[in-house]
């Protein structure tokens, strides 16, 4: 059967007219499937609750930092008894492709937090615009986020596009997760507040956890990578001096996608991995935050990404998280940290920020 379909497809694509017919049929079939698997469950949910709320753009990809953000958002919504419907980014793109993005119009929309406003991840920013434009009658919250635009001709042009669309919406609220993004967002958008990264609302310290051992190296390898090969070699040299061969590499981005059902299981595995280490060495934002919430000693390597240092300011008072600008300080900082026996993570100082966010959501939920 597969061979027959392939043969038909090849014949169709050799003819311009047949190709158009084939693509049209494929689109119709895709739209029917989209309506069955995505649209109908949304319609059913909308009928089942008095106040529909949509948590959207959540991950199904491999980045555990993004999953931890979504997980914390889910916990927050549970704490304020808000019944929500989750739509992942993958499903959102499908809804958009088949013209169903406005199915959310008129209802409360919560856009997943992270570091994706602006042009660092342009496809995400463009989808944010589409969501805002397609749902003019919704109240929309963009949960704690970082923003970045290059000071180039293209960066300035894209910023202007976003400013027009964002500021044209009558009920859009934005939350910045660090001061630099907050100041910039306040200068270009209305209704902006400062709230920490959502993962800082979690506390994953376990007093009775197993004995810690060795060093866990968690470094970036994507477009936000800033360490050179020589700098990585220098880091490894210092780790060898302190730990010998008792170290291993890890990452907050796995080698496989993570479904919403797998989210908590995979996060628990990663938190356990962090808890079992004496020291984390990272240039990843959520490498640092996972270390903080699990009470794990951590050396944070400076990055050209402002969100890392910006978010560090929230936890700079934690004696077990050290931010270094100069690799020559690595060994000294490492030995100081290893003298720590038990670390405690107290996130009560963030309560007023998260309570403010909850209050804002509840206000819209009850209206």
Residue ranges and their predicted role:
Residues 2-367:
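Active-site anion-handling motifs in enzyme catalytic cores
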């Amino acid at each position: 059967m597969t061979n027959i379909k392939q043969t038909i497809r090849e014949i169709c694509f050799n003819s311009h007219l047949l190709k158009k017919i084939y693509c049209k049929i494929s689109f119709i079939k895709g739209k029917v499937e989209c309506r069955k698997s995505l649209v109908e469950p949304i319609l059913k949910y909308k009928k089942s609750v008095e106040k529909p709320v949509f948590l959207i753009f959540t991950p199904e990809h491999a980045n555990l930092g993004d999953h931890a953000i979504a997980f914390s958002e889910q916990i927050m919504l549970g704490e304020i008894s808000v019944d929500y419907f989750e739509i992942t980014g993958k499903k959102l793109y499908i809804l958009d492709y088949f013209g169903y993005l406005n199915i959310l119009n008129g209802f409360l929309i919560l856009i997943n937090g992270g570091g994706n406003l602006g042009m660092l991840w342009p496809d995400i920013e463009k989808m944010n615009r589409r969501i805002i434009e397609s749902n003019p009658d919704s109240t929309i919250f963009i949960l704690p986020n970082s923003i970045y635009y290059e000071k180039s001709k293209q960066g300035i042009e894209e910023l202007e596009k976003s400013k027009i669309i964002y500021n044209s919406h009558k009920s859009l609220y934005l939350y910045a997760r660090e001061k630099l993004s907050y100041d910039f967002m306040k200068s270009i958008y209305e209704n902006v507040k400062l709230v920490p990264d959502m993962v800082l609302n979690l506390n994953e310290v376990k007093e009775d956890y197993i004995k810690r051992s060795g060093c866990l190296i968690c470094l970036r390898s994507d477009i936000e990578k800033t360490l050179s090969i020589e700098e990585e070699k220098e880091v490894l040299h210092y780790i060898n001096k302190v730990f010998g061969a008792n170290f291993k590499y890890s990452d907050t981005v796995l080698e496989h996608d993570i479904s919403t059902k797998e989210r908590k299981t995979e996060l628990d595995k990663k938190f356990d991995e962090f808890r079992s280490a004496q020291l984390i060495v990272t240039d990843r934002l959520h490498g640092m935050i996972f270390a903080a919430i699990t009470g794990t000693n951590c050396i944070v390597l400076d990055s050209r990404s402002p969100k890392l240092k910006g978010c560090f300011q929230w936890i700079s008072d934690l004696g077990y998280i050290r931010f270094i600008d100069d690799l020559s300080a690595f060994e000294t900082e490492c030995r100081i940290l290893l003298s720590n026996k038990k670390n405690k993570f107290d996130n009560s100082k963030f309560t007023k920020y998260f309570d403010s966010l909850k209050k804002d959501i509840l206000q819209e939920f009850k209206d």
